[in-house]
């Protein structure tokens, strides 16, 4: 039901946790949770990032409370790992139930056009509300655009692999010596200065969480060979206004940085 292992992307090492949806629709069991927790412990011990490939309809009914105990263990281990090494969550299909919380703990969450994420499945929500609820209404990247959970929306696994490689290249590569006092004449041209122009001045800039509060752009990048996090406000013709949404986005990004 769940496969754990070790792999490399561009020679960078990663621990992998992958759910097999073909086994009981990815149903979570206590044994699977113990296996995932063991993989997370190994990642912490070896200071190696983790990639979670998630695809689950929830816990196995026959497991009862023991499965919930296992999930609590996994979420606790992942929370303890936060800030130690990067964690990447890939919503590789439909993910419902408490395991969806793992995407909120991870540093980066990847969606595709076939990704759906929700703590309560559409069937559960429909039963509680008495309304016809479709998974497109509650679990897509667009439906979750204000939550800050969707770091990237991609076309498929190959693009996800490339994004993970780009991020790892930024945060893991050794610091390079460079002149930090270089003049940037383009900054004096206020009429043409926008988020895209500023991003072009950064090295290897990768925009994170573009769907949430789009007037506040957040980038991982390098400046003078040093890994950096950049926040650029761009309200278009009008100045961007600070509000709860974009401030929450900036705060979470700053905490990761």
Where are these regions (language model features)?
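Conserved catalytic cores of soluble enzyme domains
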Residues: 54-174
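A structural preference for short, pocket-lining loop segments at secondary-structure junctions
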Residues: 6-20, 35-61, 221-234, 248-257
């Amino acid at each position: 039901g769940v496969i754990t292992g070790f792999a490399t992307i561009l020679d960078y090492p990663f621990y992998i946790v992958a759910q097999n949806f073909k086994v009981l629709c990815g149903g979570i069991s206590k044994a699977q949770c113990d296996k995932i927790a063991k993989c997370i412990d190994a990642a912490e011990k070896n200071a190696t990032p983790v990639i979670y490939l998630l695809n689950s309809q929830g816990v196995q009914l026959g497991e009862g409370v023991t499965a919930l105990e296992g999930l609590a263990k996994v979420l606790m281990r992942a929370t303890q790992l936060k800030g130690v090494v990067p964690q990447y969550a890939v919503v590789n299909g439909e993910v419902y139930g408490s395991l969806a919380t793992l995407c909120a703990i991870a540093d980066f969450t990847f969606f595709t056009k076939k990704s759906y994420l929700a703590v309560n499945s559409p069937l559960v929500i429909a039963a509680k509300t008495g309304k016809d609820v479709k998974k497109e209404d509650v679990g897509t990247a667009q439906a979750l655009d204000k939550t800050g959970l969707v770091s990237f929306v991609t076309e498929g696994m190959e693009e996800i692999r490339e994004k993970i490689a780009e991020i790892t290249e930024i945060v893991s590569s050794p610091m390079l010596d460079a002149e930090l006092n270089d003049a940037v004449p383009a900054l004096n041209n206020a009429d043409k200065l926008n988020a895209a122009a500023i991003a072009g001045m950064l090295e290897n800039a990768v925009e994170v969480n573009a769907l949430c509060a789009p007037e506040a752009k957040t980038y991982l990048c390098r400046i003078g060979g040093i890994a950096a996090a950049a926040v650029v406000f761009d309200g278009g013709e009008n100045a961007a206004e600070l509000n709860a949404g974009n401030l929450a986005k900036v705060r979470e990004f700053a905490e990761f940085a």
